[in-house]
C-alpha cells in the first residue's frame, strides 16, 4: 500500500486528507516513481481552494517530486527502473509516496543533486528559467523588479540574476526576508511594509524605473507594478498569491505608457521533452556548480501526512524559500 493526499471538496488546508491506496502499474508511456521528496508550491493552494479547479473531485494534489523509478511502461526507452528522476509537470497527485507520470515529463537527476534539492528547486527553477531567459531575456547590468524576492521562486531568481550579471530589485515584507534576498544576490531590496514601492524604485533607478516587472503577488500589487514600468515596459504577471487580478481595464496600459502585459505559464514554455532537457540542463548546471544554492530549512520539511500544516504555514507567509513533504 502507498499513501497520498486527497481532497474531496474545495476549501482551506483542512480539506486535505491522507488516504491509503494500491498504485496501478504505469501505462505504456509512463513511469512509476517512488517519491523521496515532494515540492510544495503556492499553485497547490490555488488548486485546493478552487481558484484553479482540478478536472474532477476527489483529486490528488501536487505536480513536483524527486525519487527513484520503480516501474517503466512498455513504450518507455529513455528511462529505466532504478534511475533517479525529478519532475514538475505531472498530473495532480505528486503528494504521494508513489506516483505514475508521463515519462517525457521527467528529467534524469545528476548524482551531484540530492532528492531534496531537486524537489525544492525544479518547478521554481524552471519557472525562473522561462521568466528570465524566455518571457523577457534579462541582460547583464539590466535593472528589473521582482516581487516576493525571498520566496521559493524569488530566492532562485536572485541567484540566477546575479549569475547573469543583472541587477534584481526585490520586494520583501520583513527585514529578515530582506537579508535573505540580499544574501542570495538581490542588488537592492524594497520593504513594501515600510517604504513606498514606486517612490523607492524611482530613487534606486535615478527616476528611470524599469523595463520589466515580474509579479507573482497579483491583486495587491497590480497597479503599483504598472507604475514601476518605463514607457512601453513589460508587466509579467505569473501568480496570484494575494488574489487574482480581475476587472482589468485595458485602457490603463495606454494611460501608463503603452505598456505590455503577459500572463505566462510553465506549460506555455516547456512542453516537449527537448524543451525540458534544455531547461533542466541549464538549471542543473547552476545547482551542481554551486551558483544556485538550494537549502530547505528543517522546519519547512514536513511528513507527507502533515500536508494540512504545511499549507497553513505557507499561506501565512511565514516561510522563506522552499518547503517539502517527505514520504
UniProtKB/Swiss-Prot annotation:
Keyword set includes Manganese: no
Top-level lineage group: Bacteria
Cellular component, GO, one term: cytosol
Catalytic activity: 2 a quinone + NADPH + H(+) = 2 a 1,4-benzosemiquinone + NADP(+)
KW NADP (keyword) present: yes
GO terms for MF: mRNA 3'-UTR AU-rich region binding; NADPH binding; NADPH:quinone reductase activity; protein homodimerization activity; zinc ion binding
SMART domains in the record: PKS_ER
Pfam families: ADH_N (PF08240), ADH_zinc_N (PF00107)
Residues bound to NADP(+): 42-46, 130, 152-153, 173-177, 192, 216, 238-241, 264-266, 317
InterPro entries associated with the record: ADH-like_C, ADH-like_N, GroES-like_sf, NAD(P)-bd_dom_sf, PKS_ER, QOR-like, Quin_OxRdtase/zeta-crystal_CS
Keywords: NADP, Oxidoreductase
Enzyme class per UniProt: oxidoreductase
Annotated EC: 1.6.5.5
UniProt subunit comment: Homodimer.
Family: Belongs to the zinc-containing alcohol dehydrogenase family. Quinone oxidoreductase subfamily.
Protein name: Quinone oxidoreductase 1
Protein's organism: Escherichia coli (strain K12)
Phylogenetic lineage: Bacteria, Pseudomonadati, Pseudomonadota, Gammaproteobacteria, Enterobacterales
Encoding gene, per UniProt annotation: qorA
Amino acid at each position: 500500500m502507498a499513501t497520498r493526499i486527497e481532497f474531496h471538496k474545495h476549501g482551506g488546508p483542512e480539506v486535505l486528507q491522507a488516504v491509503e491506496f494500491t498504485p496501478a502499474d504505469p501505462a505504456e508511456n509512463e513511469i512509476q516513481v517512488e517519491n523521496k521528496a515532494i515540492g510544495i508550491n503556492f499553485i497547490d493552494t490555488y488548486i485546493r481552494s478552487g481558484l484553479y479547479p482540478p478536472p474532477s473531485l476527489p483529486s490528488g494534489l501536487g505536480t513536483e517530486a524527486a525519487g527513484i523509478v520503480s516501474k517503466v511502461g512498455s513504450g518507455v526507452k529513455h528511462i529505466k527502473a532504478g534511475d533517479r528522476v525529478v519532475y514538475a509537470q505531472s498530473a495532480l497527485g505528486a503528494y504521494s509516496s508513489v506516483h505514475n507520470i508521463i515519462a517525457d515529463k521527467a528529467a534524469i537527476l545528476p548524482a551531484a543533486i540530492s532528492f531534496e534539492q531537486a524537489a525544492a528547486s525544479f518547478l521554481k527553477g524552471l519557472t525562473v528559467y522561462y521568466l528570465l531567459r524566455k518571457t523577457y531575456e534579462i541582460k547583464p547590468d539590466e535593472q528589473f523588479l521582482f516581487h516576493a524576492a525571498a520566496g521559493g521562486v524569488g530566492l532562485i531568481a536572485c541567484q540566477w540574476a546575479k549569475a547573469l550579471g543583472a541587477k534584481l530589485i526585490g520586494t520583501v515584507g520583513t527585514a529578515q526576508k530582506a537579508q535573505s534576498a540580499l544574501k542570495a544576490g538581490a542588488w537592492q531590496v524594497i520593504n513594501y511594509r515600510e517604504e513606498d514601492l514606486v517612490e523607492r524604485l524611482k530613487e534606486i533607478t535615478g527616476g528611470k524605473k524599469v523595463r520589466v516587472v515580474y509579479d507573482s503577488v497579483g491583486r495587491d500589487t497590480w497597479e503599483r507594478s504598472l507604475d514601476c514600468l518605463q514607457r512601453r515596459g513589460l508587466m509579467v504577471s505569473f501568480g496570484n498569491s494575494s488574489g487574482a487580478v480581475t476587472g482589468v481595464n485595458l485602457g490603463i496600459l495606454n494611460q501608463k505608457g503603452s505598456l505590455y502585459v503577459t500572463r505566462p505559464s510553465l506549460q506555455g514554455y516547456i512542453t516537449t521533452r527537448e524543451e525540458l532537457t534544455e531547461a533542466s540542463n541549464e538549471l542543473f548546471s547552476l545547482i551542481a556548480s554551486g551558483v544556485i544554492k538550494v537549502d530547505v530549512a528543517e522546519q519547512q520539511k514536513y511528513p507527507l501526512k502533515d500536508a494540512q500544516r504545511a499549507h497553513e504555514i505557507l499561506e501565512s507567509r511565514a516561510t522563506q524559500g522552499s518547503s517539502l513533504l517527505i514520504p
